[in-house]
Amino acid sequence: MSEQEAQAPGGRGLPPDMLAEQVELWWSQQPRRSALCFVVAVGLVAGCGAGGVALLSTTSSRSGEWRLATGTVLCLLALLVLVKQLMSSAVQDMNCIRQAHHVALLRSGGGADALVVLLSGLVLLVTGLTLAGLAAAPAPARPLAAMLSVGIALAALGSLLLLGLLLYQVGVSGHCPSICMATPSTHSGHGGHGSIFSISGQLSAGRRHETTSSIASLI
């Protein structure tokens, strides 16, 4: 019995292949959250890229400075979001990360996405407020209509991103306790099954011993 008890903990460990498969499954946890963050990233890339190209293509001598600066900022912001998505996909395909907190940071819906959305919201908000302030500063009675409208739109978009990120973080923090509470119950369930199996094994061994002794006495 002592040898069986010594071999039991070793048998409970997972083989390396199963551990590798489990690491790959870490990237696909919480699919709804991942899909939401992916949609937001695609919207940022498409919106900022299209807006930046539109401003750069309509640059003229009269309004060249602010259109050139704003279009460049929007294009760089779209490039930043795109690079983050490509980097996460490349790291996932290469399977070069074996730590859970690194996967949770880089996967879709993780900490890196929240940081990118925060940076994008701040950049859009600051750019929009700057454009609106510059449009109203020279002549408050007749501000530049295009500059003011672009500034208000960018400020509103940045505010929506920051508000959405705040609500997202509140929702994530609200779901964390329930997940943490569900994990110990799962482990306790597995422990209960293990105890049932061990008890049944001991009972079957005892019955075999009694059967053997009775046969020996009859002989």
UniProtKB/Swiss-Prot annotation:
Keywords: Membrane, Transmembrane, Transmembrane helix. It is found in: Membrane. Changing R107L: In a breast cancer sample; somatic mutation. Pfam families: TMEM125. One of its GO terms (cellular component) is membrane. Signal peptide: none annotated. InterPro entries: TMEM125. The chain crosses the membrane at residues 36-56, 68-88, 114-134, 147-167. It is a multi-pass membrane protein. This is Transmembrane protein 125.
